[in-house]
From Swiss-Prot:
Pfam families: GAD (PF02938), tRNA-synt_2 (PF00152), tRNA_anti-codon (PF01336). The gene is aspS. It is an enzyme of class 6 (ligase). CDD domains: AspRS_core (cd00777), EcAspRS_like_N (cd04317). Belongs to the class-II aminoacyl-tRNA synthetase family. Type 1 subfamily. One of its GO terms (biological process) is aspartyl-tRNA aminoacylation. This is Aspartate--tRNA ligase. ATP binds at R226, D227, E228, Q235, E488, G540, L541, D542, R543. Catalyzes the attachment of L-aspartate to tRNA(Asp) in a two-step reaction: L-aspartate is first activated by ATP to form Asp-AMP and then transferred to the acceptor end of tRNA(Asp).
Length: 599
């Protein structure tokens, strides 16, 4: 049984003692990193979230403490009191390495079994073990540093927004399911058998209702939930910095959030963000980088060479152009040195993005070498080289197909080449850009209808309104995303505040009037009562912390994350519900075989 504190107070953290504290009597509390014996003395490295302090036990220092220390093992939780003295053998690798504590009193507050993971910086244990024993994983000082950054970031965000007259308002966690986009997490209602709440994917409708309520400027740091197939750096529950403003236009929201980003990155990471942040249309981003989340830390833009090759007698290029597609290319500096095998691997790589293959031209010292040499004339070759701005030693990598495939495959290839050839020179660079003028709709082949690129409440650009019914694919939106180093940091839009336009939007999405009112009637009803022009934005807080903390794994910035299958190794959630609970909720679970037969 562990000893009680009985009034004993900690007077200093383990990482704090310095030479100026020599001669002082202090009390430290923490966990044993290691216990070693040397020359008749015991040396314990005592750790807390601030660092490690060496504590010395000896017969002549205090016999009782020395005897107790012999049984102390790693991860025991202890309290020590003693005098700070200079170390005979200095450890310059530790901030406390010039001093040590001569222990005059030891309390063993609690014992520990042998831990399944070793508590140290840069732990290389298997992820499932780290997540199962997350409370041990979180003892590591580098994990504490991340959550100190997270706490500092949320405070910085709140300070900035409240200084700009934003009001923190909580919105419901139990909401109505509106099946559009990702799947909802459903919560059965005991009071209304057979009916369900949904956990919010975002506070979208409620924050718009707050604008109708006259709140003017709202914000919330809020949990959101999406039951989707998890990709890298996605979690089923995540934290969003959510905001909405009335009587504003797009430029107002972007300027305010540029100020927020500059404030937070300076205060938390000491980074000066250059303002104003550059802007790029969705169309330009796709054509130049093959992505609406371009990584601008390196060049290598996609170049359109359709005009250069349109008269070539090469069926792949010809058929792509005739079908309304294009021929585009990347210029890889130094790529002429690549052998056939790595070029073939790049060809296989683009095929995973539905490209039919990769044509290439290498500009070697002794002439041009190409996978399509027999179709190239000197004039066409020279025209391509000039358009690409290529030089001797370079390689030109070409894809021909419908534009969606060309952009996707070359965009992915661009990022792959950046990894392989280390094209990002400054890994600590923060390169921001706004992406604007997104399409309002995208066509779903699976559902055979148009779906909203962002959500159904995004306002279309006025100049494109005439296309809303006749050519939805041509309509651009008043939506904007903030991209950092190839990752979407946040996104938002100006909202529709006109009931007639909102109904036109629902109709374009394939909703009948009855379906629109059934799903979103409470918003449409509110729009009868003078809604103001409004818009907003939401940042992914978890992703922002990843950048500020310098980690590439989203699980590092969430205290108790799920794995890629939305499973919690620590609590073993989800679990089987008690039969009594299911009965109260009016729920029956189909046997697996019966479920499969019904499907």
């Amino acid at each position: 049984m562990g000893e009680a504190l009985n009034g004993l107070k900690r007077t200093m953290m383990c990482g704090e003692p310095r030479e100026e504290h020599v001669g002082q009597k202090i009390t430290l509390m923490g966990w044993v990193q290691r216990n070693r014996k040397l020359g008749g003395l015991d040396f314990i490295d005592l750790r807390d979230k601030t660092g490690i302090m060496q504590v010395v036990f000896g017969e002549e220092i205090n016999a009782e403490a020395f005897e107790k220390a012999k049984g102390v093992r790693p991860e025991y939780c202890i309290a020590v009191t003693g005098e700070v003295v200079k170390r005979e053998s200095v450890n310059e690798n530790m901030p406390t390495g010039f001093v040590e504590l001569k222990c005059q009193s030891l309390k063993i507050l609690s014992e520990s079994e042998t831990p399944p993971i070793y508590i140290k910086e840069n732990l290389d244990a298997a992820e499932n073990i780290r997540l199962k024993y997350r409370y041990l994983d979180l003892r590591r000082p580098d994990m504490h540093r991340i959550f100190e950054i997270r706490s500092k970031t949320t405070k910085s965000i709140r300070d900035y927004l409240e200084k700009n007259d934003f009001l923190d308002v909580e919105t419901p966690m139990l909401t109505k399911s509106t099946p559009e986009g990702a799947r909802d997490y459903l919560v059965p209602s005991r009071n209304y058998p057979g009916m369900f709440y949904a956990l919010p994917q975002s506070p979208q409708i409620f924050k718009q209702l707050l604008m109708v309520s006259g709140f003017d400027k709202y914000y919330q740091i809020v949990k959101c939930f999406r039951d989707e197939d998890l990709r890298a750096n996605r979690q089923p529950e995540f934290t969003q910095v959510d905001m909405e403003l009335s009587f504003v236009e797009q430029d107002d929201i972007m300027a305010l959030n540029e100020g927020l980003i500059a404030h937070v990155f300076k205060e938390v990471a000491g980074v000066d963000v250059k303002l104003p942040i550059k802007r790029m249309t969705f169309k330009d981003a796709m054509e130049k980088y093959g992505s609406d989340k371009p990584d601008l830390r390196f060049g290598m833009e996609i170049t359109n060479i359709t005009e250069d090759v349109k008269d070539m007698d090469f069926v792949v290029f010809k058929s792509a152009i005739e079908a309304g597609g294009s021929v585009r290319a990347l210029c890889l500096k130094g790529g002429a040195a690549l052998g056939r095998k790595p070029l073939d691997k790049l060809g296989e790589f683009v095929k995973t993005y539905k490209a039919k293959g990769l044509a290439w031209i290498q500009l070697k010292e002794d002439g041009v070498k190409s996978s399509i040499a027999k179709f190239l004339t000197d004039d066409v070759t020279n025209s391509i080289i000039e358009t690409m701005g290529a030089e001797t030693g370079d390689a030109i990598l070409i894809v021909a197909d419908k534009e969606s495939v060309v952009f996707q495959s070359l965009g992915a290839l661009r990022l792959e080449l950046a990894k392989q050839f280390e094209l990002i020179k400054d890994k600590n660079e923060f390169n921001f850009t706004w992406i604007t003028e997104f399409p309002l709709f995208e066509y779903s082949e699976e559902e055979e209808r148009y779906t909203a690129c962002h959500h159904p409440f995004t306002a279309p650009m006025e100049e494109d309104l005439d296309f809303l019914e006749s050519a939805p694919g041509k309509v651009r939106s008043k939506a904007y995303d903030l991209v950092l180093n190839g990752e979407e940091l946040g996104g938002g839009s100006i909202r529709i505040h006109d009931m007639e336009l909102q109904q036109r939007m629902f109709k374009a999405l394939g909703f009948t009037e009855e379906q629109a009112w059934e799903r979103f009637g409470f918003l449409l009803q509110a729009f009868k009562f003078g809604p103001p022009p409004h818009g907003g934005l939401a940042f992914g807080l978890d992703r922002m912390i990843m950048f500020l903390a310098g980690t590439e794994n989203i699980k590092d910035v969430i205290a108790f994350p799920k794995n890629q299958n939305a499973y919690c190794y620590l609590s073993e959630a989800p679990n089987i519900a008690d039969e009594k609970q299911l009965t109260e909720l009016g729920i029956g679970i189909l046997p697996k075989q019966e479920k499969q037969e019904q499907e």
